[in-house]
Amino acid sequence: MGYVKWSYDTLDKFCHDVFRKFGFDEDETEIIKDVLLTADLYGIESHGMQRMVRYDKGIERGTIHPDAKPEVVFETPVSAVIDGHDGMGQIISHFAMEKAIEKAKKTGVGFVSVRNSNHFGIAGYYAEMASKQGLLGMACTNSEAIMVPTFGRKAMLGSNPIAVAMSAEPYPFLFDCSTTVVTRGKLEMYNKSGKPLPKGWALDANGQESTDAPDVLANIVGKKGGGIMPLGGNKEASGSHKGYGYGMLCEIFSSIFSMGVTSDKCCTFKDRNGICHGFAAIDPAIFGNAEDIKAHFSEFLETLRQSPKAEGVERIYTHGEKEILAEKERRENGIPVNDNTMVELANLCNYLKMDFGAYFEDYELPKDSKFFSGNY
């Protein structure tokens, strides 16, 4: 399967109309599609358009409640706990980070922990909400268990990504990564492409290394054992315990502080997923002059970029640069979407009684795709 490129405006219009069909109001729709398309613009395909079908299935199963509103259930001047009541993760998370930012602007710091939510997209989106207002932003989330702990053979933690963002010149700093070697979404992309997984990513039900994407994904869904390795692989000598530990830090900020559902139990209920998030915003001004701190940080980032390069390498990047470059290129030349994802979107349109061809003119569906059903 190959890729086809679409303009940002084409995908924006499509996402807008789909989420309105799902029952979200205009403001909610704007938030959801902005999170999704930001992922695609940044080159994080696993968390972009290809997630739409999973969201629809969540709504159909009743694990995502489109009409739910986030509620503050505990609060201090510097912290809050929010119950998402099983609503859309992007809407809940946007609300939560706004709360953290509000507190940071008043007191210097804001910490918010969320329970009873759903998949929220890319963590970096919410960290950037704070950095764009001159604050340091942090976002993390637990998820359905996919990480096999060091020395284990059963998934017990989610991919548990952590993102940190801070303003700098000429490029802002944005670090966003899972605490597993890769995310579940990356496995889904390999499954769609039909390619074997790279070695060092996943384990089968017996705890042995596997390159079989369909089998690993089926085991994750069926809770049969196996899953994805922590950062550092599956051996302590290679640093597996470090990724495992970072995953636990995320779990503390999300499910533990909120008294929510831990990763091993997420997505095991019939009527909810119970996913939890953590957010923080910190005003650099609590440490001194904010502009001086920004300049100092910017200088160090430039020092990193100008440091000696390995032989044959032309450039050293700081975190967030590649996303900026990807966004520029994709806004100019189009966003690539996998053919199998296009088939899923066509099936979704049939189900929602939307005209797929009205959005994607002249696109011919590959009917031989294993993802083609004709009606979803």
Where are the regions a protein language model picked out?
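Acidic, glycine/proline-rich low-complexity segments that act as flexible tails and inter-domain linkers
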Residues: M1-Y8, K13-I32, L37-T38, E45-P66, ...
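Catalytic-core signal marking the mid-to-C-terminal active-site face
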Residues: G2-F14, I252, F257, T262-Y376
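Active-site cofactor/substrate anionic-group-binding motifs, chiefly glycine-
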Residues: H47-I101
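Residues forming anionic-ligand binding surfaces in small-molecule and nucleic-acid pockets
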Residues: V73-D83, H94-G110, T211-L231
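A generic, well-ordered mixed alpha/beta core segment in the N-terminal half of proteins
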Residues: S79-E169, C177-S178
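Phosphate/diphosphate-binding glycine-rich loops and adjacent basic-rich segments that engage nucleotide
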Residues: M147-V221
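Secondary-shell segments that build the walls of catalytic and ion/ligand-binding clefts
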Residues: P196-C266
